[in-house]
Amino acid sequence: MDITSIAWGALMVVFTFSLSLVVWGRSGL
């Protein structure tokens, strides 16, 4: 596994996490 795929994987995880956090905040949970 090279550094590029590691960086992309981390970016996807952070993006998904922040997106779900925004959805949670707007739901009022």
UniProtKB/Swiss-Prot annotation:
<protein>
    <recommendedName>
        <fullName>Cytochrome b6-f complex subunit 8</fullName>
    </recommendedName>
</protein>
<keyword id="KW-1133">Transmembrane helix</keyword>
<comment type="function">
    <text>Component of the cytochrome b6-f complex, which mediates electron transfer between photosystem II (PSII) and photosystem I (PSI), cyclic electron flow around PSI, and state transitions.</text>
</comment>
<keyword id="KW-0813">Transport</keyword>
<keyword id="KW-0934">Plastid</keyword>
<feature type="transmembrane region" description="Helical">
    <location>
        <begin position="3"/>
        <end position="23"/>
    </location>
</feature>
<comment type="subunit">
    <text>The 4 large subunits of the cytochrome b6-f complex are cytochrome b6, subunit IV (17 kDa polypeptide, PetD), cytochrome f and the Rieske protein, while the 4 small subunits are PetG, PetL, PetM and PetN. The complex functions as a dimer.</text>
</comment>
<keyword id="KW-0812">Transmembrane</keyword>
<dbReference type="GO" id="GO:0042170">
    <property type="term" value="C:plastid membrane"/>
</dbReference>
<dbReference type="GO" id="GO:0045158">
    <property type="term" value="F:electron transporter, transferring electrons within cytochrome b6/f complex of photosystem II activity"/>
</dbReference>
<dbReference type="GO" id="GO:0042651">
    <property type="term" value="C:thylakoid membrane"/>
</dbReference>
<dbReference type="GO" id="GO:0017004">
    <property type="term" value="P:cytochrome complex assembly"/>
</dbReference>
<keyword id="KW-0472">Membrane</keyword>
<comment type="similarity">
    <text>Belongs to the PetN family.</text>
</comment>
<dbReference type="InterPro" id="IPR005497">
    <property type="entry name" value="Cytochrome_b6-f_cplx_su8"/>
</dbReference>
<dbReference type="InterPro" id="IPR036143">
    <property type="entry name" value="Cytochr_b6-f_cplx_su8_sf"/>
</dbReference>
<dbReference type="GO" id="GO:0009512">
    <property type="term" value="C:cytochrome b6f complex"/>
</dbReference>
<keyword id="KW-0249">Electron transport</keyword>
<dbReference type="Pfam" id="PF03742">
    <property type="entry name" value="PetN"/>
</dbReference>
